[in-house]
Amino acid sequence: MPRVKGGTVTRKRRKKMIKLAKGYYGSKHTLFKVANQQVMKSLLYAFRDRRQKKRDFRKLWITRINAAARMNGLSYSRLMHGLKLAGIEVNRKMLADLAVHDEKAFAELATVAKNNLK
């Protein structure tokens, strides 16, 4: 039986990895072995950070809401509890957007929350 070296398959596989490593610094975009390791690590980072991004944005929204709530004499937790008691269902993303772009509307929501806490 003749020996099969698989040259075209190997070349195609390596070329694909080098293509994925385009834009990487130094030997990471030219040498297959290093590029392969970096691409694998990059894919892991991408997978992990797609989930991390959701947590990061939630943290950011909560920080913004808390800052705006404290400007209106409430803490974040009391604001959220007051809104829940008032039956106002506004998600954190929208509340943070209001806190940044429409301070009057946020102040009205804070007033409603304050009144429902008593």
Curated annotation (Swiss-Prot):
GO molecular function: rRNA binding; structural constituent of ribosome
One Gene Ontology term from the biological process aspect of the record: translation
Pfam family, one: Ribosomal_L20
Family assignment from sequence similarity: Belongs to the bacterial ribosomal protein bL20 family.
Keywords noted in UniProt: Ribonucleoprotein, Ribosomal protein, RNA-binding, rRNA-binding
Described purpose of this protein according to its UniProt entry: Binds directly to 23S ribosomal RNA and is necessary for the in vitro assembly process of the 50S ribosomal subunit. It is not involved in the protein synthesizing functions of that subunit.
Record bears the keyword RNA-binding: yes
Species, as recorded: Bacillus cytotoxicus (strain DSM 22905 / CIP 110041 / 391-98 / NVH 391-98)
Protein name per the record: Large ribosomal subunit protein bL20
Listed InterPro entries: Ribosomal_bL20 (IPR005813), RIBOSOMAL_L20_CS (IPR049946), Ribosomal_protein_bL20_C (IPR035566)
Record-linked PANTHER family: 39S RIBOSOMAL PROTEIN L20 (PTHR10986)
SUPFAM superfamilies from the UniProt entry: Ribosomal protein L20
Any GO CC annotation of this UniProt entry: ribonucleoprotein complex
